[in-house]
């Protein structure tokens, strides 16, 4: 009887996994919009030395900058980079 219950549970899991819908892929424009809204603004080297008057044109990315973005801060950090497009 226990093996019958195990078979039923396994079949139910198989049906649940097989019928799961895949999420639609986002277009490049949607990805760019979401990338630009993600993270914390940061000051690039081109924004000037004064952080209070800087326009904060960069965005902090954990790890490294994604494709299409470039590092805009001159110092090196292992944890995060200040990047802009």
From Swiss-Prot:
<protein>
    <recommendedName>
        <fullName>N.vectensis toxin 1 4</fullName>
    </recommendedName>
</protein>
<dbReference type="GO" id="GO:0005576">
    <property type="term" value="C:extracellular region"/>
</dbReference>
<keyword id="KW-0964">Secreted</keyword>
<feature type="propeptide">
    <location>
        <begin position="21"/>
        <end position="36"/>
    </location>
</feature>
<dbReference type="GO" id="GO:0017080">
    <property type="term" value="F:sodium channel regulator activity"/>
</dbReference>
<feature type="signal peptide">
    <location>
        <begin position="1"/>
        <end position="20"/>
    </location>
</feature>
<comment type="function">
    <text>Binds to site 3 of voltage-gated sodium channels and inhibits the inactivation process. Is highly active on DmNav1/TipE (drosophila) and is only extremely weakly active on rat Nav1.4-beta-1/SCN4A-SCN1B, and on human Nav1.5-beta-1/SCN5A-beta-1. This reveals high specificity for arthropod over mammalian channels. In vivo, when released into the medium, this recombinant toxin induces impaired swimming, paralysis and death of the crustacean A.nauplii within several hours. Also causes paralysis of cherry shrimps immediately after injection at very low doses.</text>
</comment>
<feature type="disulfide bond">
    <location>
        <begin position="65"/>
        <end position="83"/>
    </location>
</feature>
<dbReference type="InterPro" id="IPR023355">
    <property type="entry name" value="Myo_ane_neurotoxin_sf"/>
</dbReference>
<keyword id="KW-1015">Disulfide bond</keyword>
<dbReference type="GO" id="GO:0090729">
    <property type="term" value="F:toxin activity"/>
</dbReference>
<keyword id="KW-0738">Voltage-gated sodium channel impairing toxin</keyword>
<keyword id="KW-0528">Neurotoxin</keyword>
<feature type="disulfide bond">
    <location>
        <begin position="42"/>
        <end position="82"/>
    </location>
</feature>
<keyword id="KW-0732">Signal</keyword>
<feature type="disulfide bond">
    <location>
        <begin position="44"/>
        <end position="72"/>
    </location>
</feature>
<keyword id="KW-0165">Cleavage on pair of basic residues</keyword>
<dbReference type="Pfam" id="PF00706">
    <property type="entry name" value="Toxin_4"/>
</dbReference>
<keyword id="KW-0800">Toxin</keyword>
<comment type="similarity">
    <text>Belongs to the sea anemone sodium channel inhibitory toxin family. Type II subfamily.</text>
</comment>
<keyword id="KW-0872">Ion channel impairing toxin</keyword>
């Amino acid at each position: 009887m226990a093996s019958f219950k195990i078979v039923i549970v396994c079949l139910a899991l198989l049906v649940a996994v097989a019928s799961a819908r895949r999420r639609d892929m986002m277009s490049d424009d949607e990805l760019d919009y979401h990338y630009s809204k993600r993270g914390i603004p940061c000051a690039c080297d081109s924004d000037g030395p004064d952080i209070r008057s800087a326009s904060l044109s960069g965005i902090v990315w954990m790890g490294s900058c994604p494709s299409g973005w470039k590092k805009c801060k001159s110092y090196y950090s292992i944890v995060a980079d200040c990047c802009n497009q």
